Amino acid sequence: MKNIILNNKNKKEIQNYLRKVIEIGLDFKCQERFRTNILEKERYNELLEFPDEGKDILELLEYFKLSILPYCSNFSSINFMGFPDSGNSMSGMVGAILSDLLQQNLINSSFCSPIASFLEIAVIRWLRQLVGYHNNDTIKDIFQVGGIITNGGTGSNATVLLLARENHRSNTMNEGVKNPGEYKVIVPKGIGHYSIRSSLMWLGCGNNIIEVPINEFKYNLKELKRAIRKNKGSIMAVIIYVGDSRTMTIDNIEKICKIVKNEDDNIWIHADACHGFSLAFSSNLKHFIKGINNVDSISIDPHKVLMLPYTLSALLIKDAEKMKLISSNSDLIMQEPFAFGQITPFIGSKSWDSLKLWFLIKNIGIKEIGKIIDRRYNMALFLEKILNASEDFIVINNVKINSVMFMYIKNKKNIEYNIEELNYINKKIKEIIDKEGIYYLHQFSILDNIGKLKKNATIYPLRYMSGNDNIKREDIIKMVRYVRNIAKRVIKFYLEEKRK
């Protein structure tokens, strides 16, 4: 076991092992298929066996390559078209590897991460500048930074609801929630992300979500105003989706801010822009998120939209000093000016995840990232165009970022199937796609809020949403052809069987 701990004597040998690791990982990422094998239940016990004896690292790597890797999902495949989390940027991978090797802990700065803390501050300031938040010329301490890095959008949203709670009823952290009904949060009906409801319950505020009706996947503004007035004094936050996780619809940011602040200036307005913030890089598309600088906070997920390895999210706060509402005091977290541990709830030891984004932005540059976002948007528009031109597919949403929801309907001019049958057909299509493992498209239930098939009927569309910039138009065309061929099989076999 001479090589279990790195030292100067075995450094060369461990370098060879790590080269092998990188080779395995890169070969996997460059596979065309989304998945090679499906894990069978019979293997569960084997995977759960307790390892009494160790194995040689090369033997273990070979076992991993042959027996584990084929069952992994390849988000970097050009055929992975259901989510944008491709994780295949060169500079992002460099940052991820270095972050793990360097072992910096950003809970404190003076000895744990003397320079890492300041590079993380730089990344947060770049993000603030992109969305239009003001940055001070100089910063004296962590409470002037105006944001934190978290490990995902759920962590960012949970933290912001903690902030909203303290802003709504001061000193709740010390005194506790006395009346959960006074801590309500407004979301758009049917498209809210689960993290908001879950976070509200985790924070002891109960399931006090108010769902406001929507028009074309955006707030019905009259109903929003009515909900605020009906619950006057008990609304702690209103959530705006700047690209909801299903349709990528961008809500009316400026109008919502005006309505909310006119009704109650103390209500916290939070923009969940985990996807939509990417448009801030693009001079051509940033007008879609106009007014985002007016909200109290913004959650963003670079790991979703900037080709970064998991995980990296950020929470940006317009008024940086508000972070004092949720600060921690402990002699384990040194009370020094730039210790992030003072303002990162739910996180203790803190890895240098932001290094991935630091490398990516410094390597590619803001302008070039903007061109990548433009291309991604245009690729979604291309798919929308060919689906609209087809006779057998219908697009369910208005494309604004990179989500295209669509359903196979066989014949637009004469739709012979009812909603139940169309849902059955499209769920069977998805089932076969998943079983074959060549492509990945997402699927979920959603109300047909635009009325493409039947207004507010529950439907099960397929969803394309890619952040893999290796994808070309011909790949999109191949995917549509593949789905169409499966659909014809479904129509021929499964639907006939169902009607017996």
Per-segment meaning from a language model:
Residues 98, 120, 124-127, 156-164, ...:
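Buried hydrophobic packing segments
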Residues 290-391, 397:
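Active-site C-terminal subdomain of aminotransferase-like
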Residues 156-324:
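Conserved PLP-enzyme active-site core in the AAT-like
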Residues 1-144, 431-450, 462-471, 478-483:
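N-terminal entrance/gating region of PLP-dependent enzymes' catalytic architecture
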Residues 82, 190-192, 216, 243-245, ...:
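Short, glycine-/Ser/Thr-/acidic-enriched flexible segments
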Residues 226, 254-259, 382, 424, ...:
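Alpha-helical scaffolding segments of alpha/beta enzyme cores, especially the outer helices
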Residues 128-162, 210-212:
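Short loop-beta-helix segment that forms the pyridoxal 5′-phosphate
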Residues 41, 344-350, 354-375, 384-425, ...:
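Conserved small-domain helix->loop->beta segment predominantly found in fold-type I
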